[in-house]
Amino acid sequence: MKISKTQLTPAKCALDLGDGSERGLYVNQDYILRKLGRPHRGINIMYCYYPFDKEWPQRVSEACKDTNISFAWDYPYDDYFPYRGGIDGNHDGEPFTCMRDIRKHGQEVVLTLTCDPNVTDEQIEAIAKDLVPYGRMMLRLNHEATGDWFSFTKRASYKQVADFYVRFQRILKKIAPNVSTILCIGGLEPGSDKIEKEAEFAEAVKETDIWSVDQYLSLNWGWPYEVALKDNSKHKRSNTKEVNKPMLISEFNADGDVTGPFDQIATVKEFCEYIKADSENWLSGFTFYQFRDDGRLGLEITDPNNSDVGVEQPILGAYKEIMNDDFFKQGIEVKGDAELPVTLRWGSSEDSEGIAIDVDLEKNPVFAEAYFEGSLADANLMMEINGQWFYKAPGVKFVDFMPAFFDGKISGPKTVKLNIFAPPATGENDPSQGEDWLTNYYYEIKELPRLRFEFEPVM
């Protein structure tokens, strides 16, 4: 079989996906990959850290379940799941189980963390040490920082919130330079060319790696305490063309509570077409919020009878079309011939080196299978064929590629490439692999999988 060296390259506009928040539980990456057919650049998970509060480390809505609450952010601290790392932390629990799951599946961790601005340097150092093994991840610290709903904005002035961001950033960079920081603040002040709270956040803007805003084309921000009816006030809807400044959008959607399921599709697709048509390419990426939602902000909504069950929404099919648009998906470039053994490098979903196997097809297959024997049995692999991605976990010896040929049928003879990449098998980079271990992971592939492609039924 002919094999080639390949390189993952960035999309023109990257897609990240929210997975778990105050509005929904984390959904495992095996399920999401099966539903959507391809990975994202990154997966955003949302946690909080308020170690001085008497309710800590409980999730605050559980600690205060007998308290009369009329707004989602009226609790003593933010109702995200608690970040259980830090000093004397437990790396066997959340968010680390989720972070490892995300990276095994060839995606970057985007950790959103709301944090008490009074935490000590020692506590920040401990969090930074937690993040060292997770490669080229992103940290969105104290997002929507120019708002007034999160607990950290009620414990400090905006200048103090900004100064805390700078302090955290500087400590983080000394310990975990592999982590890129995201400063998520407001956009331009209405009728002005100045950034909201520009004076207070000037130093934070200079220090951060990435600047972003959150933008909902429609949102019922009274959820879950108010239904978005025409006569109610706690919902808004924006014209998509008002979002026209260079930015990373860290939370994006149109709320089905406001638009309904069909206008939600139209609004999101209109915005994506606008992004594609813009000659300045002002948007580097956006995070769709989110996969499964307790309200109507999800590709699925949570079944109220069973939170392990998601109810697919019409937006999911439209979102799959967006994911498969060349503008929004990473590229795979062929870099010349290869011979075994080959060392594969995993840097990120936008910068990794793999191999491609040429597969000659007579027509659409009836069976399309791969068997992983010998040293490959313990490999952790992400694979792509005919536009669809598949995951092979360590210990798995068989993968069925036929789903790639259900919708993407081959009408005649064709050569397709089976692309193979090797993200970290444990979800963490290996410090024994050399000086660049913070940002790269290596795996030597010594043999190829045994392929079975058949074009007629057995009987």
Predicted segments — roles?
Residues I45-C48, L111, K197-A228, L248, ...:
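Aromatic- and acid-rich polysaccharide-binding/catalytic face
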Residues D78, Y216-T259:
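Glycoside hydrolase catalytic-domain groove-lining segments
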Residues Y165, Q169-E196, N244-D257, L283-D293:
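Aromatic-lined carbohydrate-recognition surfaces of secreted/lumenal glycan-active proteins
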Residues A128-Y158, T181-L188:
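Active-site groove signature of glycoside hydrolases
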